[in-house]
């Protein structure tokens, strides 16, 4: 387990179960035998005739976790270290030993939140942090390409707004947070129909990067190794979902769209293990900054920010689309905002100033404590297909929150949203968590913003093919069947 991953790093931590209940296949011997521990610490099966057989350790992958209902969200963080910076270093070490004709192409995508965290942690601008990160990835580690997450995010935002506009069921709930998605699939399957079917920027980026590189470099998906730098450990679980991978002839296992996810703080630990520091990294030449991207990749759109929350701006973009549909010139509507019992519950309403009518409304719900309140109000009432009505209250939004009235809800598992993810660089000693979150968010908001453009979607459609666009942008969710612990093997 990674030394930087602990319960202290997890927001709204949910304690893991005492044992993992994932059944493990055991090959039992037909003869009498005993288990002994060898001199080197290995487990040995010793037969009555004195013969010894070394036993293989039980192994558990992230994919196993996603298919098991034994634990949820935070508990799985005990296992996400299996996909970590050490895995990346191992892959780079293996690559260095290969002949030039057999080397893979390494590409890294970097989230906006991670860039802001680096800048806040080391007291530099986001542009300087980007220049140092480019230097680390391209010159020190030997990556071929470095891209931002802007292209994937623009596509995700546009399709999210289109989905809400077409939906006949309220609410549509953001599904870009894998911690939230796992929680729903394993404990509240009645919420699955409300989840947005649009992939996250990480996965859209992963699909497009492998497609573009394979087409322009004439290689197979297995010859491209894609790393994402993200603010959240649960993003490792998302990358491990079976649907986000492709089959390739000659390969025993499917090839993932995102091969490895490392968090912001894991990048810092990687540097420490290499006797380096982020502050000591040189800044890459400006001619290579933001331009070391695959051929045909729209670099000019890739590093820009978007208006809205530091969790990706989903609510802002969706609500703006709904407002423009009613009021194209934005001259006879206003947006009202109301805070709930805490800063992580917000309600936004588009009001027609001429009639006083509420044209559209949306909510922002962050943190598991608030999510649990939300989920309870989505439970079907007995004998009816409608959600449970919220209790009347004039005190706070959260007390009166009625999910069925919202067109869209931006849901994130971490209090404060993605900018405050468990994988971000932590607050310095003496700095309060809320103050540090605000400082990181200030860095995030300093990234220049651009309006979301359909041009990126048009480009992606040409690259991907118009008939297969569904595979590029659509995700699927399903209930994870509960395992009977009484029948499962424990170890």
Swiss-Prot record:
Q: InterPro entries under this entry?
A: Cytosolic_Fe-S_CAF, Fe_hydrogenase, Fe_hydrogenase_lsu_C
In its keyword annotation, does this UniProt entry include Lipoprotein?
Answer: no
- Keywords for this entry? 4Fe-4S, Iron, Iron-sulfur, Metal-binding
Q: Which Pfam families match?
A: Fe_hyd_lg_C (PF02906)
Instruction: Check the record and name the Gene3D superfamilies matching this protein.
Output: 3.40.50.1780, Fe-only Hydrogenase (Larger Subunit), Chain L, domain 3 (3.40.950.10)
An MF annotation (GO) of this entry: iron-sulfur cluster binding
Residues reported to bind [4Fe-4S] cluster 2:
177, 232, 414, 418
Q: Which GO terms describe its biological process?
A: iron-sulfur cluster assembly
Which cellular component terms (GO) are annotated to the entry?
Answer: cytosolic [4Fe-4S] assembly targeting complex
Q: Which residues cross the membrane?
A: none
Protein residues bound to [4Fe-4S] cluster 1: 20, 65, 68, 71
Superkingdom of source: Eukaryota
Q: Which family does it belong to?
A: Belongs to the NARF family.
Q: What does this protein do?
A: Component of the cytosolic Fe/S protein assembly machinery. Required for maturation of extramitochondrial Fe/S proteins. May play a role in the transfer of pre-assembled Fe/S clusters to target apoproteins.
Protein name per UniProt: Cytosolic Fe-S cluster assembly factor NAR1
State the organism named in the record: Yarrowia lipolytica (strain CLIB 122 / E 150) (Yeast)
Originating gene: NAR1
């Amino acid at each position: 387990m990674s030394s930087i991953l602990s319960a202290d790093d997890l927001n709204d931590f949910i304690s893991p179960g005492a044992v993992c209940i994932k059944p493990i296949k055991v090959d039992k011997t037909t003869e009498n035998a005993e288990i002994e521990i060898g001199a080197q610490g290995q487990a040995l099966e010793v037969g009555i005739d004195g013969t010894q057989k070394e036993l293989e350790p039980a192994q558990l992958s992230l994919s196993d976790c996603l298919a098991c209902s034994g634990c949820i969200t935070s508990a799985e963080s005990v296992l996400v270290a299996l996909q970590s910076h050490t895995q990346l270093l191992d892959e780079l070490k293996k690559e260095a030993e290969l002949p030039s004709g057999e080397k893979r192409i390494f590409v890294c995508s970097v989230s906006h939140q991670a860039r802001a965290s680096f800048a806040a942690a080391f007291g530099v601008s986001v542009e300087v942090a980007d220049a140092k990160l480019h230097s680390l990835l391209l010159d020190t580690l030997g990556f071929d390409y470095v891209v931002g997450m802007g292209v994937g995010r623009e596509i995700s935002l546009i399709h999210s707004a289109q989905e809400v506009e077409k939906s006949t069921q309220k609410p549509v709930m953001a599904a870009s947070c894998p911690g939230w998605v796992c929680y729903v699939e394993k404990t509240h399957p009645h919420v699955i129909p409300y989840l947005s079917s649009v992939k996250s920027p990480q996965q859209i980026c992963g699909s497009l990067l492998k497609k573009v590189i394979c087409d322009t470099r004439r290689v197979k998906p297995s010859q491209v190794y894609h790393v994402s730098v993200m603010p959240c450990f649960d993003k490792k679980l998302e990358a491990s979902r079976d649907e986000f991978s492709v089959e390739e002839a000659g390969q025993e296992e499917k090839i993932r769209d995102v091969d490895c996810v490392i968090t912001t703080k894991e990048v810092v630990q990687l540097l420490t293990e290499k006797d380096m520091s982020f502050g000591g990294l040189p800044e890459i030449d400006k001619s290579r900054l933001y331009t070391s991207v695959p051929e045909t990749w729209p670099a000019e759109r890739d590093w820009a920010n978007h208006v809205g929350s530091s969790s990706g701006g989903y609510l802002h973009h969706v609500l703006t689309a709904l407002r423009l549909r009613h009021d194209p010139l934005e001259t006879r509507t206003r947006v009202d905002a109301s805070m709930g019992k805490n800063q992580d519950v917000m309600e936004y309403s588009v009001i027609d100033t001429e009639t006083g009518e509420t044209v559209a409304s949306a909510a922002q719900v962050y943190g598991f404590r608030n999510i649990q309140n939300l989920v309870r109000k989505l439970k079907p009432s007995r004998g009816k297909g409608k959600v449970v009505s919220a209790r009347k209250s004039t005190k706070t939004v959260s007390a009166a929150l009625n999910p069925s009235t919202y067109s869209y809800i931006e849901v994130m598992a971490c209090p404060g949203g993605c900018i405050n993810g468990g994988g971000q660089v932590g607050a310095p000693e003496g700095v309060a968590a809320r103050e540090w979150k605000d400082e990181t968010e200030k860095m995030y908001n300093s990234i220049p913003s651009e309006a979301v453009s359909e041009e990126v979607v048009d480009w992606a459609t040409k690259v991907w093919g118009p008939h297969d666009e569904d595979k590029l942008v659509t995700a699927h969710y399903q209930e994870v069947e509960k395992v009977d612990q009484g029948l499962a093997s424990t170890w």
